């Protein structure tokens, strides 16, 4: 048999016509040794390439040999079957028989690929794909497949291909594999390995993974990262925030202080305040109390930073100095207002525009107009002061004193309730013990619903994320009164306090109250509150979400479950969650469920606008108006502050939608997307601004649309045109304040006062550099771009300027004769001066022409402008310089950050890259050079009317007493 096989293989043209040898395999009378020889011959690729289609017909016979326990060459038979299936391109079957062959398959080299190498690599590829699929399905993985994957992993680790193993671990959510790969890194950690750790961290943070899996991977990364000779402690503390390990973060700061690295410790403290919740920061401060402070001076600064004093002061300085609110625009909108709803909208919009600026000129200059506010409009008028004076905590009581309750509440308490909400907004996300105690006392002594309503909302926004059980219980007492209006605010406030800390007890309590109460306002408030409490919990919130969504006969609970699902997975980009939301859009009959499910896609994909566009594009043309509204808002959330042109193109047609609430949603969404955009970054923005004014001024437009247009104008210019609405913090992670603020803003569908909460999502577009003493030094930044690309939008023209009629100048006949005569005289004088002195001739003509002819012409002309000449004279010169300078603290919008550098890099060494923005602490490089500091923040203010570099006195406190409301 062996001789025949050799002759057959060596014949001219290679082996062919294998029928005779195939009969050997099929015949039960053939000797076993002959069958073994034939199998080995066919396993040679030189033979199989020409005969595999013939062998394919005999596969049943070969498979019978595999089932025969007495056959000695199972591996040869299995290998042959596997190769034939490979030729048939049935790769899963090829893998199955390769594994049954019980032989070691390892990847072949990439050089000189032959048939065998192609086969082996395809089997490996199929094995990995199968392993991934089974892992995601949670199905059992065959032991032989596990063994093969283990061999692949071991081989890659031996070759130091660590990232391949980590990627495979992420795709299969195999923590042991990731741990094995990271542990295999050398103790001295090269730059490449440190980069791998950073990539691992970015992958686990930005990926759609289970919370427990994420925490375990981050813990592994931290342990390995600490082995570095000089680890990035800022990155490590970022990990501690993600894993909610406040004690470790405190220990890190303490160790840096002990090593005399106080500047770096200050930077970490600033970053913690920006990204961590109040509850986390409280635990950090408690940890400090348990430690012995060696450097008390530095620790005092750390305490001040973590309590928010330094950040609030720096941002207040920035907003006041750079306030660029367009007062003319506000007056123009006011002139077009004819209804109470539009009046209410402008009060809210003014608060947003002047957020943090302490500039209440519009209210003080229009007291008669403001006094027209009644009932809840009066509530909002006073509450807007909380936005205007946000951060002015030291003088909060002085600002609000005229409106706070005295011995007895005047009227129905709308003014007092608004003042309490304003007090909470001034302390938003920063409710210290004094502020919370004050609000708690007001909450306890409140005598009517508007006062309790304002006290609850103020209490909740000041204590956002504190997870204080005692504060939660104080608000619960209001909920148990079973009042509609105060019950709504109590439900929201309970969720704000427990934001990110939902537990079984809280869920059961609020769910049961939703079922028991007859007030739909209270039910809606609890829905928003539970959604806020579920923020960021991901898999930990699944039991509560499934229980709520599973309430088949209760649409309020189902919509609550949808909101919780959106917030629990906000920013994760989980495709499974998006599919669940889309399923509810398609199948649930309730309109609230459909609307919130569509909006939820924007929350989940808030870090991935392009993916959100692909999911939501078709929904913008859905037959159901609530779905269209939800699609618009989803795009606004996911693309907030980006100026995304694709999103704008999808939303623009909805401005003319037949449904008024869809048109309103489209305007709000576009305002979110175009916030802080310029013609350079988004060519549509100026046209949209004109469209808003047109909507506000149209007499036949729906009042709901006008309300939305006015609020949209406030969003466009939020923070004096110095802030942007964004869903991420400085570390590009989902921001609790932003997500919670947006969820509360969406509650504005039912209750107008909730529009104030969008300010929680407004982040200052600033770059503030501080020295080691936490003072702001005088220094310049260089922006490597034309100054007009990132400039403020042009101011609106006043009505007086628009109404001026420009008439062509009338030139009398005698004037023409005089001008001609004067022209001849001037030319003669010019020739004489040129002959006398060449140098003076260069200057004399222009002097004579301007001083000799122009005044005479003006005397004879009528005092009006020439349209053509006026435009030429008044047109500003365009700045064509390729770069420009900015002064610290500077306004730097997100699109501008990558283009910023310090003018004198030898002066300061920042603790983090400038493109991160926000507050950056820097070490002085040249300490012998004299350091100049920026003047005190509150004492000098640039008003919108100021010109040049002169600085005016600060605005006087808005202390009118609106007793005639």
Swiss-Prot record:
The keyword Repeat applies. Transmembrane segments: none annotated. GO terms for molecular function: enzyme regulator activity; protein kinase C binding. One of its GO terms (biological process) is regulation of protein catabolic process. Residues 863-882 have a biased composition (Basic and acidic residues). The keyword Ribonucleoprotein does not apply. It comes from the Eukaryota. Gene3D superfamilies: Leucine-rich Repeat Variant. PC repeats lie at residues 380-413, 418-452, 454-488, 489-523, 560-595, 630-664, 665-706, 708-738. Belongs to the proteasome subunit S1 family. This is 26S proteasome non-ATPase regulatory subunit 1.
């Amino acid at each position: 048999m062996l001789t025949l096989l050799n002759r057959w293989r060596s014949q001219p043209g290679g082996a062919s016509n294998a029928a005779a040898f195939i009969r050997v395999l099929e015949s039960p009378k053939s000797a076993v040794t002959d069958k073994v020889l034939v199998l080995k011959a066919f396993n040679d690729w030189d033979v199989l390439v020409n005969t595999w289609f013939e062998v394919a017909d005999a596969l049943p016979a070969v498979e019978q040999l595999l089932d025969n326990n007495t056959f000695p060459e199972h591996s040869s038979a299995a290998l042959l079957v596997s190769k034939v299936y490979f030729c048939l391109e049935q790769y899963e079957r090829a893998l199955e028989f390769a594994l049954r062959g019980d032989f070691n398959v390892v990847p072949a080299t990439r050089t000189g690929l032959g048939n065998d190498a192609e086969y082996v690599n395809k089997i490996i590829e199929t094995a990995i794909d199968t392993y991934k699929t089974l892992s995601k399905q949670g199905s059992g993985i065959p032991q032989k497949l596990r063994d093969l994957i283990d061999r692949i992993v071991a081989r890659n680790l031996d070759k130091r291909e660590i990232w391949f193993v980590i990627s495979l671990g992420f795709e299969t959510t195999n923590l042991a594999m990731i741990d094995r790969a990271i542990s295999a890194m050398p103790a001295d950690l090269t730059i490449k390995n440190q980069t791998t750790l950073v990539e691992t961290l970015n992958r686990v943070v930005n990926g759609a993974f289970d919370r427990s899996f994420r925490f375990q991977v981050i813990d592994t990364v931290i342990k390995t990262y600490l082995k570095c000779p000089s680890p990035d402690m800022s990155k490590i503390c970022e990990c501690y925030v993600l894993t909610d390990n406040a004690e470790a973060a405190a220990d890190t700061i303490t160790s840096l202080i002990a090593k005399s690295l106080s500047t770096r410790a200050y930077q970490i403290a600033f970053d913690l305040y920006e990204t961590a919740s109040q509850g986390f920061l409280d635990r950090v401060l408690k940890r400090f109390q348990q430690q012995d402070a060696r450097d008390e001076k530095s620790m005092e600064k750390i305490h001040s930073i973590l309590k928010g004093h330094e950040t609030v002061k720096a941002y207040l300085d920035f907003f006041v100095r750079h306030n660029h609110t367009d007062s003319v625009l506000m007056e123009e909108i006011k002139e077009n207002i004819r209804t109470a709803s539009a009046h209410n909208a402008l009060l809210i919009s003014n608060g947003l525009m002047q957020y943090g600026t302490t500039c209440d000129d519009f209210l003080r200059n229009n007291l008669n107009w403001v006094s027209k506010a009644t009932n809840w409009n009066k509530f909002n008028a006073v509450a807007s002061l909380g936005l205007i004076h946000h951060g002015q905590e030291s003088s909060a009581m002085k600002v609000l004193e005229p409106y706070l309750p005295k011995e007895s509440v005047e009227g129905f308490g709308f003014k007092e309730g608004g003042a309490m909400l304003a007090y909470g907004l001034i302390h938003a996300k920063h409710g210290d013990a004094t502020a919370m105690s004050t609000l708690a006392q007001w909450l306890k002594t409140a005598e009517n619903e508007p006062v309790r309503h304002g006290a609850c909302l103020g209490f909740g926004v000041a204590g956002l994320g504190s997870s204080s059980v005692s504060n939660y219980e104080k608000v619960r007492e209001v909920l148990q009164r079973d009042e509609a209006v105060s019950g709504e605010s109590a439900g929201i406030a309970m969720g704000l306090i427990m934001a990110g800390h939902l537990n079984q007890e809280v869920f059961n309590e609020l769910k049961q109250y939703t079922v028991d109460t007859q007030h739909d306002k209270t039910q809606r408030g609890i829905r928003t509150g539970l959604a806020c409490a579920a923020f960021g919990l991901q898999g930990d919130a699944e039991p509560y979400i499934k229980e709520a969504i599973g309430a088949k006969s209760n649409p309020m609970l189902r919509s609550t479950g949808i909101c919780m699902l959106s917030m629990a997975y906000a920013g994760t980009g989980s495709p499974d969650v998006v599919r669940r939301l889309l399923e509810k859009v398609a199948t649930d009959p309730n309109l609230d469920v459909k609307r919130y499910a569509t909006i939820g896609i924007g929350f989940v994909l808030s870090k991935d606008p392009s993916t959100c566009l692909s999911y939501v594009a078709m929904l913008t043309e859905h037959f159901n108006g609530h779905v269209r509204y939800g699609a618009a808002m989803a795009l606004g959330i996911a693309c907030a502050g980006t100026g995304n042109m694709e999103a704008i193109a999808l939303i623009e047609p909805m401005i003319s939608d037949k449904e008024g609430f869809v048109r309103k949603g489209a305007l709000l969404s576009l305002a979110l997307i175009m916030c802080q955009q310029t013609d350079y970054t988004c060519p549509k923005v100026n046209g949209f601004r004109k469209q808003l004014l047109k909507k506000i001024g149209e007499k036949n437009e729906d009042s709901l649309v006008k309300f939305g247009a006015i609020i949209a104008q406030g969003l466009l210019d939020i923070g004096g045109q110095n802030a942007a609405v964004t869903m991420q913090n400085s570390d590009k992670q989902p921001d609790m304040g932003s997500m919670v603020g947006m969820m509360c803003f969406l509650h504005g569908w039912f209750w107008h006062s909730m529009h104030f909460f969008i300010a929680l999502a407004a982040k200052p577009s600033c770059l503030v550099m501080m020295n080691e003493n936490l003072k702001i030094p005088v220094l310049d930044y260089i922006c490597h771009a034309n100054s007009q690309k990132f400039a403020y939008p042009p101011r609106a023209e006043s009505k007086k300027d628009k109404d001026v009629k420009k008439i062509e100048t009338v030139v009398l006949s005698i004037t023409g004769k005089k001008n001609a005569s004067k022209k001849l005289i001037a030319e003669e004088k010019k020739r004489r001066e040129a002959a006398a002195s060449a140098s003076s001739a260069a200057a004399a003509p222009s002097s004579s022409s301007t001083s000799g002819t122009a005044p005479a012409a003006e005397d004879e002309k009528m005092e009006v402008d020439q349209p053509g000449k006026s435009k030429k004279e008044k047109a500003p010169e365009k700045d064509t310089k390729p770069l420009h300078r900015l002064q610290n603290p500077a306004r730097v919008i997100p699109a501008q950050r990558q283009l910023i550098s310090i003018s004198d890099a030898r002066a300061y060494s920042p603790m983090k890259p400038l493109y991160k923005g926000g507050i950056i602490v820097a070490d002085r490089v040249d300490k012998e050079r004299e350091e100049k500091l920026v003047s005190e923040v509150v004492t000098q203010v640039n008003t919108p009317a100021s010109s040049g570099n002169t600085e005016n006195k600060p605005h006087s406190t808005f202390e009118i007493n609106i007793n005639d409301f």
